[in-house]
Amino acid sequence: MNYTEFFTNRSTSEISKDLLGRTLSYNNGEEILSGTIVEAEAYVGVKDRAAHSYGGRRSPANEGLYRPGGSLYIYSQRQYFFFDVSCQEEGEPQGVLIRAIDPLTGIDTMIKNRSGKTGPLLTNGPGKMMQALGITSRKWDLVDLNDSPFDIDIDHKREIEEIVALPRVGINQSDPEWAQKKLRFIVSGNPYVSDIKKKDIKKNHGFI
């Protein structure tokens, strides 16, 4: 798949929005674990106070953001790991964080990996999603998507009723401008979106 083209040549916000409805899958060597992407956040580089590359910060820890579009940037916070894909040309450190998936295949294994958690608690957040997939290290950090056990189906996507743009989660409120920027994109009404209220959940999970 031409991930480089998909993850470049347009804004990172557009890329993040376009990921919604597409299938993210992981081959663990025994089976394919997969789900529909329902929540993604854009991080727009050196000007973005919430980005790991803000101000041009560059280190071995965030090098993935500086790689060509379609490279993996996997990082950890506490015991959790997070799945980012770099966007834009090499040296332009922007990326998209996949925050949640609506599970499709390998669900029993996901439940086991999440110690028995079921329903939305299975994958309704970036750390939970990676735990459900069984990712417990940064092994695939810096690797091109094409050379990894991960796959994003850029040729097909589910039809979505409505995409909503919201402020990102966990952003430092000391900078109101960036804290309130609507760079998080969700499938409206999907129960696996990380902070959705029960009254807002749709029976069709927001798909047509």
Swiss-Prot record:
It comes from Lactobacillus johnsonii (strain CNCM I-12250 / La1 / NCC 533). GO terms for biological process: base-excision repair. CDD domains: AAG. SUPFAM superfamilies: FMT C-terminal domain-like (SSF50486). It holds the Pfam family Pur_DNA_glyco. InterPro entries: Formyl_transferase-like_C_sf, MPG, MPG_sf. Transmembrane segments: none annotated. Belongs to the DNA glycosylase MPG family. GO terms for molecular function: alkylbase DNA N-glycosylase activity; DNA binding. Keywords: DNA damage, DNA repair, Hydrolase. The keyword Ligase does not apply. This is Putative 3-methyladenine DNA glycosylase. It comes from the Bacteria. Its EC number is 3.2.2.-. It is an enzyme of class 3 (hydrolase).
